Amino acid sequence: MSNSKSSKKPVVVYGASGYTGRLVCEYLREYNIPFVAAGRNVNKLESAMKSNVAGIETASYEVVEVLHTTEALTHLFKGASVVLNTVGPFAKFGTEVVEACLAAKCHYTDTTGEQDWLITLDQEYGARFAAAGLLLSPGLAQMYTTGEIAAQLCLDTPGLDTLDIAVFWGGSPTIA
């Protein structure tokens, strides 16, 4: 446990003890990508890794407890290439993570489905990330991925000029 050391692993999964964070850690382990499993509670992180990430004993990873402040996150992110933020609601908890990524000079991704957060990132951070040569890629959640892939296929296929996509989801809305 530490919030005083910089990352020497290429990927930081912030919010690694949550459902999506654990899935990401499992994926990174499968591809032998070293990572830092970071979050606010070292005990929850360690338990989540040991209990919910199949084969975690074969992974090159660290568990790091960190305060949710721009300063602490910046220090943790230094040395990493990319941060995957799974801590939501993103409109409430995302700003510190994005600011820390800029300060630490690492790419930012998240799993948001919050339209207001996507707009905020584009308007307030898009140009700053671009000027720094950094990727700002929110909304990597499945609900957007299908449409993005279909749109790219359309762009790459001569003769296609129209794309109709319909996505139907069940369940109830999330409340932040």
Q: Residue locations for each model-derived region?
A:
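Residues in the short beta-alpha loop(s) of Rossmann-like NAD(P)-binding domains
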Residues: S17, R40-V42
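Rossmann-fold NAD(P)-binding glycine/threonine-rich loop
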Residues: T112-L134
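A short, basic/flexible loop-to-alpha-helix module at the beginning of a structural domain
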Residues: M1-K8
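NAD(P)H-binding glycine-rich loop region in Rossmannoid oxidoreductase-like domains
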Residues: P34, N43-T120
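Short beta-strand "acidic-cap" motif of Rossmann-like dinucleotide-binding folds
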Residues: A37
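Conserved anion/nucleotide-ligand pocket segment
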Residues: A141-M143, G147-A176
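N-terminal Rossmann NAD(P)H-binding glycine-rich loop of SDR-like oxidoreductase domains
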Residues: K9-N32
